[in-house]
């Protein structure tokens, strides 16, 4: 089974996104109640060495030889990518291939570390998550590792935004009744309005089953209410404004069962999305 590279996956915002997962599954700084990938097995608060950059690049090149050019190469997966000390080197090496722009999807909890901010600067796009500006709500939603706190996240994100030259888009995961109250929305609005170089805000919600069954998806009306309540100058869109790309992934060879499993472990898909990813008819995937 591929150890690092998965997809391409049909992304709502990134089209055909080829993923690179730098760390072992479910290694994270948070144990978010809304996570679609079950519970975190190892909670960490500092970056570590996990994998060989050469091994990652070798696996990436093998995958790229088999597929048409992806729209994005995205560092994400089943945990927090900035926990990998090699993330900066991987970004630089991938960009040297000149195949696709590089995006990093992060929970933002390590952006207070200068070495993490510096590592992400070469990326073309960074999408950090920010669900609240209140510590008690942060604890309730994210259940962080010891040593991870909201104050560092807020300071780190502001510092990163002040110097990052790429596209910065903040994602808010909306949990009805928890972070969409007037107080919560007003707090997020104040912080985001002051965030330098912010390009856009994206409101997500539980479109796939979360690890905590008490978390429900926000309705279209609830998402619109939060969108209007933020009252930001930058564009604010919701998960319902975007549809997964309809572009098929053209492959030279049939995807292996191991490759499919590697994808599903990191990015749960519908059968229609799998059909696109595998370049095979839906009927051949039905039981």
Language model regions located:
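Auxiliary Fe-S-binding modules of radical SAM enzymes
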Residues: 1-13, 57-58, 65, 183-287
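Canonical Radical SAM [4Fe-4S] cluster-binding loop centered on the CxxxCxxC motif
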Residues: 12-55
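Short strand->helix junction
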Residues: 25, 42, 80-81, 177-178
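Short, well-ordered alpha-helix to beta-strand connector turns
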Residues: 70, 123-124, 234
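Glycine-rich beta-strand-to-loop/alpha-helix junction loops that act as flexible
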Residues: 74-80, 107-108
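Conserved AdoMet/S-adenosylmethionine-binding subsite of the radical SAM
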Residues: 83-226
